[in-house]
Amino acid sequence: SKVYIHGLIRDEKGQKMSKSKGNTIDPVQIIDKYGCDALRFTMTSLCTYGGQDIKVSDERFEYGRNFANKIWNASRFVMMNLEGVDNKAIDKSKLTLVDKWILNQLNETAKIVNDNMKEYRIGEIAHTLYDFFRSEYCDWYVEIAKIQLQDPELKANTQRVLRYVLDMSLRMLHPIMPHITEEIWQDIKAISGFGADEDVPSALIIANFPKYDEEWAFPKEAEEMNLVFETIKSLRNVRQSFNIPTSATVDVEIRTEGKEKEIFGEIEAYIHRLAKVNNITYANLD
C-alpha cells in the first residue's frame, strides 16, 4: 500500500488553523455556500507536489464553484444541440480540421492525466483538466461548433464530437467532481446515448477511464489549428489596442503563403466569427 501525504492546510495569512484562533474553515459551511464539488476541486487544485503547505481562504472556493458552473452551462449547451443526433460513433472520414484538433487535445489530456496519476501529482491533474475543458473545449471548440452545427453536412458529426469529448471529459473529472459529472452524464445518456463501441455502464463511476489512443492523435492538424488560434488572438489584441468596439466588424489582411494560406482558407469562417472580421484578403510575405 502507498500513503499520500499533503502539506499542512493553513489560513490565508499562512498561520496554522486552530479553534482558539478562530481561523478554521468549516467544510460543511463551504459546501452549503459553494457546493461539494467546488470544495473538492478547489482543494485538489491546491495540492502541490512535494507537500508544501497550502493557504486557504473562503474566497478561494469561488474558483471551484465557477468551474462547476462552467461545466454545467457548457453541458447544457451540448445537450440542447443533441436533438436528432444518432447513436453512432464519430465518422472519421468527415472530421474537420478543428474536430481533429480537439480530439488530439483530448487525447493528450488523457495521457497527461494518467501520467500524473502514476506520480500522485493530484494538483496537476486538476489544473490540466481545468485548462482543457475551460480553454480548449469551451472557449474554442464549442464556439466553432456553433458554426459547424449550422452546416447540414457537418452537423451530425459535430454533434458526435461534442458528445464524445464531453463524455471523456466527465469521466476524467469524475474522481474530483463526482456529483455534477454523474448528473450530467446520466442526462446525456437519457437524451442520446453515447455512440460508443463499448457497452455503456449504468453509472459514470464504473465507466472506463480515458487513456491515450493513437487512433485520436492528430499532431499535424493540432499544430495547424494552433496557428489559427494565435492569429485570432493577435486580431483580438489589435482590436483592443485600437479600442475597436466588440460589436464592430473590421477588414483584415493576412500575410502568409504556401501551406499556411491553404489552412486559413479552410477555416476562414471561424476567423470571421471569432475575431469579428468582415473581409479577409491575403498577401504574400515580403
Features from the language model and the residues they span:
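Non-catalytic, structured segments within soluble enzyme domains
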Residues: F41-T42
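Short helix- or helix-capping micro-motifs
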Residues: G35
